[in-house]
Amino acid sequence: MYYPFVRKALFQLDPERAHEFTFQQMRRITGTPLEALLRQKVPSKPVSCMGLTFKNPLGLAAGLDKNGECIDALGALGFGSVEIGTVTPRPQPGNDKPRLFRLVEAEGLINRMGFNNLGVDNLVENVKKAHFDGVLGINIGKNKDTPVEQGKDDYLICMEKVFPYAGYIAINISSPNTPGLRSLQYGDALDDLLAAIKNQQQVLSQKHHKYVPVAVKIAPDLSLEELIQVADSLVRHNIDGVIATNTTLDRSLVQGMKYCDETGGLSGRPLQLKSTEIIRLLSQELQGRLPIIGVGGIDSVIAAREKIAAGASLIQIYSGFIFKGPPLVKEIVTHL
């Protein structure tokens, strides 16, 4: 397959520059006959989850296409779902560069992007132009300069704007790169946020005459006690799904490697075991009351099967896709 050669060239570039270059090329060929070069035939393996039918269980995780610029090109690769974002009410530049690092030996990434995006209105315009026939997830967050106490307002603003266009909405309260954001995962702050989100979902469902499920994305760095509390809150508020997990602050598996001490969230192979364990514990606690979307270090068929065996109904990839490329999509969907 051609990807090892493409990867070699891309890995000569700074990681963020490589990402920008790739998206530039994808945008250039979308809607032209060259788009056929991206298209991969994958088997149909329908899965029902959150009241939606997914063409197959494999999705692209949020963070790769923050502004919804390459939905059709990514969809052509065979994903059953594509999750775009994280998007915030207002555009923001994110953290200072450099803010994305490859840990090549570990097949991991560290990022401290900080929700860099062009704002929810820009994303909605891009979504309107897309023709992807899979499930489109839209991941929403709060602006960095919005006080955490008013954070729920940012989620409600984004919900209202994306609701007519989303297959499902993902609530990101677990990025380590927005100060104070992870505090929304705990106790009264979480209950307050979930109550507001559920109320907004009901209001918007009546307004638009359609139901859009809401999933909450959680961190892998929760203690067992915290995880049990989160699970209890999700069930009490009738949230439709949980995405487990976001990136980790734990560096125990990458000690001594280049960039291991960079601030930010670690993803990829070093996150694999930790995220699978969170899924297993969450599954035990939830007892099937809401579905789990498993993400974190999936880079092979076996890693994908482990997530499903632990209790995930759907799975997503990101870092594995960077390191293994489009062939990973076909390989996982074919052999799941």
Curated annotation (Swiss-Prot):
Keyword Cell division: no
UniProt-annotated location(s): Cell membrane
GO BP, one annotated term: 'de novo' pyrimidine nucleobase biosynthetic process
Reaction equation(s) it catalyzes: (S)-dihydroorotate + a quinone = orotate + a quinol
Keyword Cell membrane recorded: yes
Membrane topology: Peripheral membrane protein
InterPro entries, sorted: Aldolase_TIM (IPR013785), DHO_dehydrogenase (IPR050074), Dihydroorotate_DH_1_2 (IPR012135), Dihydroorotate_DH_2 (IPR005719), Dihydroorotate_DH_cat (IPR005720), Dihydroorotate_DH_CS (IPR001295)
Main location (coarse class): membrane
Residues annotated as binding FMN: A62, G63, L64, D65, K66, T86, N139, N172, K217, T245, G268, G297, Y318, S319
Role description: Catalyzes the conversion of dihydroorotate to orotate with quinone as electron acceptor.
Gene name linked to the record: pyrD
Gene3D superfamilies reported for this sequence: Aldolase class I
EC identifiers of the protein: 1.3.5.2
Cofactor(s) recorded in Swiss-Prot or TrEMBL: FMN
Name of protein: Dihydroorotate dehydrogenase (quinone)
Record: active site: S175 (nucleophile)
Any GO CC annotation of this UniProt entry: plasma membrane
Organism: Cronobacter sakazakii (strain ATCC BAA-894) (Enterobacter sakazakii)
EC supergroup of this enzyme: oxidoreductase
Residues that hold substrate according to the record: K66, N111, R112, M113, G114, F115, N172, N177, N246, T247
Comment on bound cofactor: Binds 1 FMN per subunit.
